[in-house]
Amino acid sequence: MNPILRDILDLLDVERIEENLYRGRNAAESEHVFGGQVLAQAIASAYRTIGDARDLHSIHAYFLRPGDWNAPILYQVDRIRDGKSFTTRRIAAIQHGRAIFSMSSSWQKHEVGLEHSVPMPDVPGPESLRSDKEAYVELAKIRPEVKRFAYRFDAIDSRQVENILMMAPSNVARPPQKHTWLKTRDPLPDDPEVHLCMLAYMSDLDFMSTSLLPHGRSPGGDRNNFQGASLDHALWFHRPFRADEWLLFAKSSPSASGARGFVRGQFFNERGELIATAAQECLIRVRE
């Protein structure tokens, strides 16, 4: 396994402090706390109180305050309910005595029922597309600051169908949709917790920027007059999946108003099955 992927997996793991209390750390090479990391660490903390007897089917999270990358994050798990079919956990992420993040999660016992799935978008497969790693290496030659984002693509093979990079300057209005193929660069352990956490991590990669496409803006092109941040994040897990196999992340933004953008995305496996759905509201504040 390549060292960057190993580091990310270690980062997404949490340390048990005592019953219902866990500790996560931050990446030394990143000068911000990535939302996908906090999502994954919160899921890992809840998972430790449940195990693999139940399937995670949904999370609903709020980002309350910016995180401090120089301090560990404590995760307090509240065991709201342990029912016959469903289990509920509420998780608070705490730094310096204040909550920076809260999440509710629901878990279901294994059941079989009715099935259907919307069709996967008709887009080129990943084999014909350029890796984001290659594109970011070139961009970093003129924008060294993007290296703090690019290191993730040493671990995650990400390929854009429309070839739109989040950190690349843009002044061209585009339709509010993007399609990205994603998977880890190396095989992962079979542990379901690892795949849940990795998908949560990947679901926050280049998601918010979809809401900027119709306005000819990008986080990379508006560094001095644009403020962006995730406000909330939701995930629904529909079917079993592996994060080390190709997944298509089909993203769209149906609305932006009131300095907030709304984005949603669907994850499909290569067989065309819908395996997860994501949604997020984000701050997209333009400074005049």
Where do the language-model regions lie?
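Terminal targeting signals and extreme-terminal segments of soluble enzymes
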Residues: 1-288
